[in-house]
UniProtKB/Swiss-Prot annotation:
SMART domains assigned to the protein according to its UniProt record, in alphabetical order: DnaJ
Domain called J: residue spans: 5-69
Encoding gene, per UniProt annotation: dnaJ
Species this protein is from: Bacillus anthracis
Protein family per UniProt: Belongs to the DnaJ family.
Protein name in UniProt: Chaperone protein DnaJ
Annotated keywords: Chaperone, Cytoplasm, DNA replication, Metal-binding, Repeat, Stress response, Zinc, Zinc-finger
Subunit structure: Homodimer.
Amino acid sequence: MSKRDYYEVLGLSKGASKDEIKKAYRRLAKKYHPDVSKEENAIEKFKEVQEAYEVLSDDQKRAQYDQFGHAGANQGFGGFGGGGDFGGGFGFEDIFSSFFGGGGGRRRDPNAPRQGADLQYQVTLEFEEAIFGKELNVEIPVEDPCDTCKGSGAKPGTSKETCKHCSGSGQVSVEQNTPFGRIVNRQACSHCSGTGQMIKEKCTTCHGSGKVRKRKKINVKIPAGIDNGQQIRVSGKGEAGVNGGPAGDLYVVVHVRSHEFFEREGDHIICEMPLTFAQMALGAEVEVPTVHGKVKLKIPAGTQTGTEFRLKGKGAPNVRGYGQGDQYVVVRVVVPTKLTSHQKDLLREFAGQEEQDDSLFGKLKRAFKGE
């Protein structure tokens, strides 16, 4: 069975504003919620409304849907069909609770293991360090399990007790009278903060949190060829996990300082090489600096300013190991600002000989004179 158009589901046109989408969703969600509606197929209709709102209320998902239809909306966002929770971790009971207050709906077990938070660290490298890679020892602030209480939060020699108010479930039932009748919501127990356990005697080191703030030294290997703005993931070096869950990850964001001579374009290195008029006109062999050392470059006679030469394999290594970039040398003629009398005489003599040459410049001069 094919899906209905999301705009049609909410009774809207494609140009509907965000506010119109939200109002339509609230109205239809109340109408079809299974706890209230007695209509046939209310659950399916509610899910359909919820699915449409999940896509159209998000600018990125809506743009994908407008361009590609249901195929675009379901690509890269984990899908929306069925009766499970969305990627944000809430079900339709949780959404409905926003209309009536409380915190009803299905909740995650507060004592289940959870991964720790990810951390981000910024580093600045010199141009050459980014080309060849480097090992760094960084010191970052992290929250680690308290050594005194082993992360329990309870004073050594004591243990946590089951919360008497929620019987260890971490949730309590709250009844509310609404225009639709009496609604029973499940919400986090305020006495144990939803953990289902109480700490009678708190650890004096961490004050019951089970964590302490530390500065941790971590060795980070910067791969050769990394570029400005790229990041490195160091697995398991983020914040400590909760309830025995795995630690988060550390993301090292790299910034590369600019170089006075070199520029970078992907894996290639670009530089400009100043040459004299004589070197360009007569040809020469010059030394060009590269990050790998100086190399000799032959300049053919008659080379024009702006000509680009390629030095194969003298660029940056690809950060993923796919070969090596090149270096491109752009030559520029340098016009001297101070000349001796002898140099001026030589140039005047050269200019006089050029006028006799039927070159492009000669043709241009005649054109301006109307010849």
